[in-house]
Amino acid sequence: MSKEKFERNKPHVNVGTIGHVDHGKTTLTAAITNVLAKHFGGKAFAFDQIDKAPEERERGITINTSHVEYDTATRHYAHVDCPGHADYVKNMITGAAQMDGAILVVAATDGPMPQTREHILLGRQVGVPYIIVFMNKCDMVDDEELLELVEMEVRELLSEYDFPGDDLPVVRGSALKALEGEAQWEEKILELAGHLDTYIPEPERAIDLPFLMPIEDVFSIAGRGTVVTGRVERGIVKVGEEVEIVGIKDTTKTTCTGVEMFRKLLDEGRAGENIGALLRGVKREDVERGQVLAKPGTIKPHTKFESEVYVLSKEEGGRHTPFFKGYRPQFYFRTTDVTGTIELPEGVEMVMPGDNIKMVVTLIAPIAMDDGLRFAIREGGRTVGAGVVAKVIA
């Protein structure tokens, strides 16, 4: 046993399997854990350990997801696999499983199928940055030309959705044979792991990104000024730095003159910490929950965007009836609700509970946002949907 296993200082990367039902996503997940456990240490998972995915609730939405982990020589991976198509849709939209990259599983015996396309589209919409293809069940196809054809089809499909279809890695393997321990197919799993290590760049850590903190509360402290509190989402704010207050009202600039945590004064607040930030020359009524504090120039307020939305089913506590164009719910971003109107795609008249749908949203007040921001759709405080900003429009 190499000492590799005990090092916990390896970069951590989040990945997952996507693709059509029965193309072998779960078998591949099991094969990866088994082959890598042999070579790099770690725990091997059996197919049925992964297949019995526990139910999770993310923003009131029921999602079945399996989480496994594995190591390569240079990295530690957390990997998600979902049993059902609906679980993928929910997972990707809510960001319950944020992926730094995805492994698209396509059976060589079938080629791309409807859910293959849908998962690629979802990946594009929700901002999965990298896709690696694993062509599965290649042991069942004798004809080299057929394999070429399937690979070409998959590459074209990925290009259609703006992934670099011509350049991304495609591995031809057999998850089942690898799981059964056949050396030539185990080799293919190692090849896949090599691509995970080299093709998916190391994710930027939250602390290295520009400072942003959603404002949860505003207090005025006699003789000191106005304090805003919240959990720092990313980056670092240092005492004496300029910050912007963005969203809802016109953007204003101020200076952070103090940072405190648990009543202790600090010289900076970092990603993940709950802090109070003292703002120079800001009146209590100038700031409100729902705005964000950010490094100047790094985020802008917007009112109109294209989104991908999952509408909760009745069983999940969602609506019992469909909604139509002209629907005006609240959109909950970070810490606050903003009313908005929706435009449905051409030819879509109504949206049923349990559907996922692309929609354009126009808010009545601007919110600090970038592509990839998650939100909830609410009616009178009850969550009826979850969404992600696919593309800011205005």
From Swiss-Prot:
Residues 81-84 are annotated as: G3. CDD domains: EF_Tu, EFTU_II, EFTU_III. Residues 174-176 are annotated as: G5. GO terms for cellular component: cytosol. It is an enzyme of class 3 (hydrolase). The keyword Repeat does not apply. Mg(2+) binds at residue 26. InterPro entries: EF-Tu_GTP-bd, EF-Tu_GTPase, EFTu-like_2, EFTU_2, G_TR_CS, P-loop_NTPase, Small_GTP-bd, T_Tr_GTP-bd_dom. Its EC number is 3.6.5.3. It comes from the Bacteria. Monomer. GTP hydrolase that promotes the GTP-dependent binding of aminoacyl-tRNA to the A-site of ribosomes during protein biosynthesis. This is Elongation factor Tu. The lineage of its organism: Bacteria, Pseudomonadati, Pseudomonadota, Gammaproteobacteria, Aeromonadales. The gene is tuf1.
